Design a protein with these regions (language model features):
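Active-site neighborhoods and metal-handling regions in enzymes and metal-associated proteins
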Residues: 1-183
Length: 183
């Protein structure tokens, strides 16, 4: 439901309704190292047409962002790939209007996708390592581990189809950079 639109919702006291989504952001530790995943699940067992559309946009953005994960890229590069596919999908769903490039330049997507695409993983689930060195984004190298977690969060608002109201979808996986790409 609407609580899926709240990043890191913690009250966990709402009743699950059959037409709503459950967003589960979970982590585990092994040998003092953290992991972090997120899944979005329809309570009824099946997405409605609006939920399915948003889920498919997020899944495409995540798939393409993961394909871009390789040595020499940066987390900013990965984020930009996710932003492109999120924005493209929001335009196709008629949630955003206008040209792709303009929506990206004007950051119109941020109303629905307000966080970065990922974060470092290590001894903490949000490892405090820097994203830049001397003002330059850190290039990915084999052995680095981070998350790829695009999402879309749509609260009630005028101007878009009511079927999209209160839909929050995020899909998060942990990525290891290898010599030739990622796993």
């Amino acid at each position: 439901g609407k609580n899926a639109c709240v990043l890191h919702y913690t009250k966990n006291n709402a009743i699950l309704r059959s037409n709503s989504l459950l967003l589960v952001d979970a982590a585990a530790e092994y040998d003092n190292y953290a992991s972090d995943i997120t899944r979005t699940i329809p309570i009824s067992g099946k997405f409605n047409e609006f939920q399915k559309k948003i889920y498919e946009i997020v899944l495409k953005a995540q798939t393409m962002a993961i394909k871009a994960c390789k040595p020499g890229k940066t987390l900013i590069d990965i984020h930009n790939v996710a932003v492109k596919y999120i924005t493209k999908g929001l335009i196709e769903a008629k949630i955003l209007t206008g040209k792709l490039e303009r929506n990206i330049k004007e950051e119109k997507y941020k109303k629905y996708y307000m966080h970065n695409t990922g974060h470092w993983l290590g001894l903490d689930v949000h490892d405090p390592s820097s994203y830049s060195n001397n003002g330059k984004p850190i290039k990915l190298k084999p052995g680095m581990i981070f998350t790829v977690e695009p999402g879309i969060y749509i609260n009630k608002e005028t101007g878009i189809d009511k079927g999209f109201h209160n839909i929050g979808v995020r899909i998060e996986d942990d990525i290891l950079i290898t010599d030739s790409g990622c796993e």
